Amino acid sequence: MIILDEPYVSPELAAYAAARQEPVLDNATARACARDYGAALNLTPEDAFASLCREDAPRLYTCSENALDWVYAHSGNNALVERVRRLKDKAVCRERLAPLYADFFFRQVTLEELAALPFEALKVPCVLKPAVGFFSLGVHRIENAAQWEAAKVAVARDAALWREQYPPEVVGGGRFLLEEYIQGEEYAVDVYYDRQGRAVVCNILRHEFSSDADVSDRLYYTSREIIESRLNEFEAWFNRVNGPLGLRNFPVHVELRRDAGGRIAPIEFNPLRFAGWCSTDVSLFAWGFHSYGCFLEDTRPDWERVLAGKEGLLYTLMVLNKPENCPPVRDFDYDALCRDFGKVLHLRPCDFRRFSHFGFLFTETPADRREELDRIIRSDLTEYIQQE
């Protein structure tokens, strides 16, 4: 079963759903996809779809957390709703996992408490983020008093904008989480739990930053070397944390960090979906399979086969986020952007007047010739912006 919802449905997902005739909730977004993509979707009326959701551990995939509102209100499956809530609310998730991370500092505060909280009360370095959040919105790393005051101003300013762009089930501007900064390399993992609660990893992306202060989603990449070195270790960790989480037939997009000593700590679990917008399609462009297809068909990637001949290559996903204090934009030069990369696999422009980014770019880049990645991760993209 699939729920398609705003802000974006990739044509690959729509084509997959049509080819498989997966039950798709009949909503405005799904009807628009059927019309715009010419996809013969198996549109299923709400009552019938809700009946399928009430099965024990239904196999449900959403492309957007905007769909969570429907799950809460109409699925009629209290166990499913509880599992979603325990992941989506980062404070609740931290409390669930606390027995596994007894020395990990976190604290939940309201917007009003945040405004009055002095820097001296913090354990730094730390991270401030919405307790219910998405897409690195409202995430701030804090090391000093100036950063703390700037973060509080930014959060107060942006909370109203989040309410306009996302429902409260996706981004909440009323409660925030303060937690210790997790050291190590950051990864984004698309993983699902099968009917027995066993983890199946469908892709692993390294999340790279331009500096310690950077919290953006600009650059992710996967490779044969990343999969081979992290797959077994990460699956074992996912199986361990599922003890307190209790997930079955459940897809999750997980952000985590692994330090030099091999200690893995979660950043967040994003329920009922894989990487947001069209990001999970990197598995198709890199490895030739749909990540969501593995979940919906209850299959495990044949890594030995798909990794053959892929040595020395990085398969990237770049989020073309707007710079801070972005001037009014008349146009964005996507052609010039693509010319700056040796092999573009796919470009996904977005409505930059509506959203906080210009689109998504997927490339194949030799690991020993990654200058194009080092450049783009530090770029504010103004060289491609045509101002009004």
Residue ranges and their predicted role:
Residues 29-122, 134, 365-380:
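Conserved N-proximal alpha/beta basic substrate-recognition cap immediately N-terminal to
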Residues 296-388:
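Peripheral (often C-terminal) accessory segments that flank ATP-dependent C-N-forming ligase machineries
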Residues 97, 122-142, 161-184, 189:
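ATP-grasp fold ATP-binding core
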